[in-house]
């Protein structure tokens, strides 16, 4: 298995100061890379710089087809995992696991054009990313709406994401035929999963703890997320009322 555990494996002298881990001239050389574990690069802004990839008109870009795992930890300046590339791009078709932890400048994970490449993605974990508002952003005008996304995803963990509002704000009819585990832990602004009907035939509940002890289910994923959100709001209101009563008693 070919792994990259530290960016110094790419002949980078000071990994804490790099801004783009895989610029265009390097990406094409990493055909056998299977696993990436990246941690504590304080100035890194982009993982995969696809924006400046140049190919002949007759060619189709194919990048990192063997990559199976991508683990990103404590990258405070990271703004893009994938920065947009040519429409004809192919790649990342074997990625199974995506872990993102402590990336406080990220506002989203995927664009639709990238998500459609991730046909084998099985597990998504997003933890302690303060600015993330959506996992999948809306399609740009030049992008086609994609409905057949995330068919292999069987596990999603969303944890300690204070600004997360939804998985996606696009009213697509998403289907999740493989989704079995869904964990939502301390995401106080998550009011819905997607603004449309969705099918999750294998999902039986949404867990609110990492040990899989407590789950909720209200018939579908959107209704369950909404129920959890309302429950959190109700608990906060009760706590505020209790504090006010204690204050008035003291006065």
Can you name each region flagged by the protein language model?
Residues 1-251:
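Cross-kingdom leucine-rich repeat
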């Amino acid at each position: 298995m070919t792994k990259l555990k530290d960016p110094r494996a790419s002949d980078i002298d000071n990994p804490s100061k790099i801004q783009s881990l895989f610029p265009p001239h390097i990406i094409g050389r990493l055909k056998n890379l299977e696993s990436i574990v990246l941690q504590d690069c304080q100035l890194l802004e982009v993982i995969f710089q696809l924006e400046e990839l140049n190919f002949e008109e007759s060619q189709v870009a194919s990048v990192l087809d063997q990559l199976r795992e991508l683990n990103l930890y404590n990258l405070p300046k990271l703004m893009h995992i994938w920065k947009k590339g040519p429409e004809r791009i192919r790649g990342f078709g074997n990625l199974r696991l995506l872990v993102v932890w402590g990336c406080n400048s990220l506002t989203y994970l995927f664009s639709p054009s990238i998500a459609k490449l991730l046909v084998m993605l099985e597990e998504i974990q997003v933890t302690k990313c303060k600015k993330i508002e959506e996992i999948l952003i809306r399609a740009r005008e030049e992008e086609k709406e994609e409905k057949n996304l995330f068919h292999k995803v069987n596990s999603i963990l969303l944890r300690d994401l204070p600004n997360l509002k939804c998985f996606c704000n696009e009213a697509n009819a998403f289907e999740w035929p493989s989704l079995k585990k869904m964990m939502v832990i301390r995401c106080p602004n998550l009011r819905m999963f997607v603004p449309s009907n969705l099918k999750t035939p294998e999902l039986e509940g949404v867990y609110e703890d990492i040990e899989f002890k407590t789950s909720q289910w209200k018939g579908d994923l959107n209704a369950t997320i909404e129920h959890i959100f309302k429950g959190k709001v109700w608990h906060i209101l009760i706590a505020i009322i209790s504090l006010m009563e204690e204050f008035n008693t003291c006065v």
